[in-house]
């Protein structure tokens, strides 16, 4: 212990190689560094895993639709361009070609952005739902404990009342009837 205190941050001349390895850095043993969060000792939470499992297929589907729209617009342009150039004047097919290309790229981008924004929205909703759940569970647990305590208190009061009546009936009831009966007869 004294050697470790004298060794300081860098291990010092008195510290052995093993002591330097245990200290790791900052003069703290490695176990404390792990506890402080320098190394992650647990994986993703259940809510994170559920969020990923739910949102990946949806986002993937929307991104696939985005890719299909892009592919369809490129193939459509490749097929329609020669037909427009052969059977129409030059300006009309050029305008249609540019319009189709712009619409295809805009559709592709819109579907991609829609997929990403829906993933973000669902992820935020899922996180908020899972963060609220423990509060509701804790509130229900507290109410159940209060109800159980109140029921126990009422049961104890009822038991004491019954016990008190039984004692009165056993001891005070016989003496009270004889004394009360004699008082009424003399009046």
UniProtKB/Swiss-Prot annotation:
Cellular component GO terms, alphabetical: membrane; monolayer-surrounded lipid storage body
Principal location: other
Short name of any one Pfam family annotated for the protein: Oleosin
Region (Polar): 2-51
Tissue specificity remark: Found in embryonic axis, scutellum, and aleurone layer.
Keywords, alphabetical: Acetylation, Lipid droplet, Membrane, Transmembrane, Transmembrane helix
Compartments (UniProt record): Lipid droplet; Membrane
Region (Disordered): 17-42, 155-187
Post-translation changes: The N-terminus is blocked.
Annotated Gly residues bias: 170-187
Keyword Acetylation: yes
Compositionally skewed regions (Low complexity) per UniProt: 155-169
Membrane topology field: Multi-pass membrane protein
Chain positions with N-acetylalanine modification: 2
Compositionally biased intervals (Basic and acidic residues): 33-42
Transmembrane annotation, as ranges: 50-70, 83-103, 104-124
GO biological process: lipid storage; response to freezing; seed oilbody biogenesis
Region (Hydrophobic): 52-123
Function: May have a structural role to stabilize the lipid body during desiccation of the seed by preventing coalescence of the oil. Probably interacts with both lipid and phospholipid moieties of lipid bodies. May also provide recognition signals for specific lipase anchorage in lipolysis during seedling growth.
Family: Belongs to the oleosin family.
Listed name of the protein: Oleosin Zm-II
Species, as recorded: Zea mays (Maize)
């Amino acid at each position: 212990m004294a050697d470790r205190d004298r060794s300081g941050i860098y291990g010092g001349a008195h510290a052995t190689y093993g002591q330097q390895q245990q200290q790791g850095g900052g003069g703290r043993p490695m176990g404390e560094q792990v506890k402080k969060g320098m190394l992650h000792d647990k994986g993703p939470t259940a809510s994170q895993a559920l969020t990923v499992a739910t949102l990946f297929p949806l986002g993937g589907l929307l991104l696939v639709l985005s890719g299909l729209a892009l592919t369809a617009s490129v193939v459509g342009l490749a097929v329609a361009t020669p037909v427009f150039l052969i059977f129409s004047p030059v300006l009309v097919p050029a305008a249609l070609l540019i319009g189709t290309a712009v619409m295809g790229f805009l559709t592709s981008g819109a579907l991609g952005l829609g997929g990403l924004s829906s993933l973000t929205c669902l992820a935020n909703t899922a996180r908020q739902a899972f963060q609220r759940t423990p509060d509701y569970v804790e509130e229900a647990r507290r109410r159940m404990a209060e109800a159980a305590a109140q029921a126990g208190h009422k049961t104890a009061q009822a038991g004491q009342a019954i016990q008190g009546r039984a004692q009165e009936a056993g001891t005070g009831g016989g003496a009270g009837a004889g004394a009360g009966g004699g008082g009424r007869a003399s009046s």
